[in-house]
């Protein structure tokens, strides 16, 4: 990670950390770096989610892009993966999404996609950071016909919706409950599943700029669990603020997380001979039960650090076509270059329809070990240093020795928030609580948190 860029672009509290001034510079410098080798006038797509700060940051970012001669196509409110899809399929120089994904409304973020539809690599981010830190802005300042042109492009959303529908199968009145998190999916999910022929119940579809992810969406699926049971839906589908994640709910109201979604899709593709190298790419956060289920089915796995960018890097490097995270990022490389909650949802309902199995039947093949995750809020400067504190390292080693291989512990700094994450898995809930509570007590004592 760099000074400005984390694992998923530039993020911070809007108007305090992620200011309009910084957004302008990111537009100006990012646009320049991503378009300097273009032979024709560069074109950049810009999308945003529903946060109240989105239009403020969009205006500043767009001004920066226009100031270096880039033509900007404003997409409005739509999913992050829609930006990636449109960049790749419409020959744009780059794309930019203004969103902080699953974070609360006070935060926002800016992430870039290259002309290939993939998130930027470390080298490109370093180039942008060097310009941000330069003492003087020496980039060209064209005038008159040299300036960029601003175009509203609502057709982009319709094209994305049509594409996702084309990857699915008719649902013939299947009862589907949607939770669009008062976020980006609120402009598209209803239309996509209506076009597929689903009978819909929708919540989290009334964004007001402040309620994105607020007690709804993939990080708060409790409301959807109740709606699924009350409406008699066959499946519930919860997206996060920018719709790059999916958490599902089965017909009984039980959660089907990213691990189970990856398993269901992976097994389906494997049986059809369509799972590249018969391998799923996952992260260190995936549950032991997921790994055991893959072993039973003879499906291989490749394991990366936490963060969908690392999953994508491994997929591109080795030619895999399915990967993701327990949190609900699922990358289906045959269809898109990044995690796409609505695409995953379309594929999941297609598998249910084609196999004739309920979601609970499909998900029951993975037995999830009890897992507990505690987030300890720390300053960003401390979250990396905490991992080197001798007492913290010692208690982690001690707990791992006690597990004797029947479980696991993971302590890591968040790549996107000022948090230290402590996670444990074990055969029983009592053991999990013991391991996590013991470690968090030591962490809090060592870094001075009561």
Swiss-Prot record:
Disulphide linkage map: none
UniProt PTM comment: Activated by phosphorylation.
Amino-acid biosynthesis among keywords: no
GO molecular function: magnesium ion binding; phosphoglucosamine mutase activity; phosphomannomutase activity
SUPFAM superfamilies from the UniProt entry: Phosphoglucomutase, C-terminal domain, Phosphoglucomutase, first 3 domains
Record keywords: Isomerase, Magnesium, Metal-binding, Phosphoprotein
Known role: Catalyzes the conversion of glucosamine-6-phosphate to glucosamine-1-phosphate.
Protein name: Phosphoglucosamine mutase
Source organism: Streptococcus pneumoniae serotype 4 (strain ATCC BAA-334 / TIGR4)
